[in-house]
Regions:
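Glycine-rich catalytic cores of cysteine/serine-nucleophile enzymes that process amide/ester linkages
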Residues: 1-66, 93-102
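A structural signal for the main folded, soluble domain(s) of proteins
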Residues: 16-23, 84-90, 129-130, 142
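Small-side-chain structural scaffolding
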Residues: 18, 28-31, 75, 79, ...
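Hydrophobic/aromatic-lined pockets within catalytic cores
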Residues: 22, 83-84, 118-123
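General structural signal for secondary-structure boundaries
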Residues: 35-52, 68-71, 88, 127-128, ...
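Activation targets extended, charge/polar-rich intrinsically disordered C-terminal tails
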Residues: 92-157
């Protein structure tokens, strides 16, 4: 239900963003705990196995964007420094209640952490401070504007 609302209010159907790490894991901020093969993956900004949420995925899109080696190094430098930080429920509340500083690094909402990584690595231009939230649909727009290609896969529900 929450995922549907995020996609709806985000204007594109996207409700979450993860990034493939060089080790083949998916990295992102989640509010829920996952148990896979006896391993517990807590809520927060962490790496999870590629199949961690297969039972709940209705559709996914893989974006591919060419960046420089320096940008890639900066992306992972910032991302690695955020590992283990808690999930930020204010990201969802921002859809309804408005202004907040989404760049506050104490906790992360998935799309806002991704945006911060990309801004730090100069992949995306820095957004104006007047914008008080970034949702997964915003990330899709930014990626396409930067020249990303994409492949969308649909699943039967």
């Amino acid at each position: 239900m929450i995922s549907t609302g995020i996609g709806w209010f985000g204007g594109g159907g996207y409700s979450h963003i993860d990034v493939f790490t060089p080790a083949g894991m998916l990295r992102g901020a989640r509010s829920d705990v996952h148990k896979i093969d006896g391993v517990t993956y807590p809520a927060g900004y962490i790496d999870r196995p590629e199949n961690y949420d297969d039972a709940n995925i209705v559709r996914y899109t893989i974006f591919s964007l060419e960046i420089s080696p320096a940008q890639e190094a900066m992306y992972w430098e910032f991302s690695d420094a955020q590992l283990g930080k808690p999930y930020d429920p204010r990201g969802i509340a921002g859809f309804a209640f408005g202004q907040r500083d989404w760049r506050d690094p104490k906790a992360w909402y998935c799309s806002e952490e991704f945006q911060a990584n990309c801004e730090y690595a100069t992949i995306f231009r820095k957004l104006p401070p007047e914008l008080w939230r970034v949702d997964p649909g915003d990330n899709a727009f930014e990626l396409v504007q930067c020249g990303a290609s994409w492949l969308t896969t649909e699943f039967l529900t």
